Design a protein with these regions (language model features):
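A general structural signal for well-ordered alpha-helical segments in protein cores
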Residues: 33, 74, 99, 184, ...
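C-terminal alpha-helical cap/extension of soluble enzyme domains
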Residues: 2-5, 11, 16-22, 43-48, ...
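Catalytic alpha/beta core domains of metabolic enzymes, predominantly
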Residues: 138-148, 153-263
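Alpha-helical scaffold segments in soluble metabolic enzymes
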Residues: 39, 76, 136, 164, ...
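Short secondary-structure transition/capping segments
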Residues: 101, 128-129, 187, 229-232, ...
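Active-site beta->alpha loop and helix N-cap motifs at the rims of alpha/beta catalytic domains
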Residues: 2-157, 287-292
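A structural signal for short hydrophobic/aromatic patches embedded in well-ordered alpha helices
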Residues: 36, 73, 165, 244-247, ...
Length: 313
């Protein structure tokens, strides 16, 4: 959907739902994914009639499916949303030439992504080289297909150049922090007002970062406990950090399971919760590539962690 920059930044000051994509017999289950997207679109608790933001991203997903599958998945998701929400596409930048072609292909869809999240680089690179390439890339893609980009910061070595990209490129409109809460204040202080949005990117435990100045957050649990994430964002936008913290405390045990040991259950714990909840309006699937259903002992932990969260479905 067409938004000017101010409208885009305000819309991104929200919960970005990153739903676990369901798989069946080793392939994306589009019927199930459509059901999950409908759940998110039809259960919008964001105050002020704000648009739902959905991201197809996550290193537990897009790094493991082909470019053709990504284009098909993005096209399907956009059609399912019908232009009534904001769509974010995660892009793995390896190999970088193929990543650029992928952005151009997705930008040509009937319902193209509104923003493209540049995921962390794998392989060796240095900060200045990343800055120089991404500046040139943003200019090329901005001119060729109007792409608006977000930068996913996972390495503190790239903090300074991430801030520079926000300030020096008109096509970078957001910085998603995936490092630590201590990085929020220097990044917020460094990004010029109105240049880009600084977003917390490590799940719904986002009250501390919001107190330090981040705007909006990403959520992997929104696809199953939609109201929890929505109400956290509502409270943060009102400046009611106590209310945000109360909900965050309720979901903390579940988030701890997801993010333990290098985020190893980031995807699969959500899938497990979708199964254990007994819901008929979302589908978890059979587990994705490299991310099978959790071990039995972890499933028991998930069951305990979500006991009090069903009210947020």
């Amino acid at each position: 959907m067409a938004l000017d920059k101010d409208g885009l930044l305000d819309t991104l000051n929200s919960v970005t739902s990153i739903p676990a994509i369901p798989f069946r017999q080793g392939a994306i289950d589009y019927d199930a994914h459509g059901k999950n997207v409908n759940y998110l679109m039809e259960n919008n608790h964001l105050e002020g009639g704000r648009l739902r933001v959905i991201g197809i991203a996550g290193t537990s997903l897009i790094h493991h499916i082909s470019a053709d599958d990504q284009v098909q998945l993005m096209g399907f998701t956009g059609e399912q949303m019908g232009g009534k929400g904001l769509l974010m596409a995660g892009i793995a930048p390896n190999p970088i030439g193929e990543a650029e072609r992928l952005i151009e292909r997705e930008a040509a869809l009937e319902y193209p992504p509104d923003v493209f999240l540049i995921m962390p680089l794998t392989g060796v690179g240095n900060a200045e080289g990343i800055f120089a390439y991404y500046m040139d890339m943003a200019e090329r893609l901005g001119r060729s297909c109007g792409a608006k980009l977000l930068y996913y910061l996972r390495s503190q070595a790239e903090l300074d150049i991430a801030v520079r990209l926000m300030n020096e490129s008109e096509y970078f409109v957001g910085l998603k922090i995936g490092t630590t809460v201590d990085d929020v204040e220097p990044i917020v202080a460094g990004v010029k007002e109105g240049a880009a949005l600084v977003i917390w990117g490590v799940g719904d435990r986002s009250t501390g970062p919001a107190r330090r100045g981040s705007k909006g957050h990403t959520s992997g649990i929104n696809v199953v406990f939609v109201r929890a994430s929505d109400e956290i964002n509502n409270a943060q936008r009102r400046g009611d950090f106590e209310a945000s913290q109360r909900i965050e405390d309720e979901i903390a045990a579940f988030e701890e399971i997801r993010f333990r040991n290098g985020r190893m259950y980031n995807y699969s714990a959500v899938v497990e919760a979708m199964h254990l909840g007994g819901f008929d309006d979302v589908v978890g699937g059979e587990g994705g590539p490299f991310n099978p259903r959790v071990p039995k002992e972890v499933a028991v932990e998930v069951a305990v962690a979500i006991e009090g969260l069903v009210k947020y479905h």
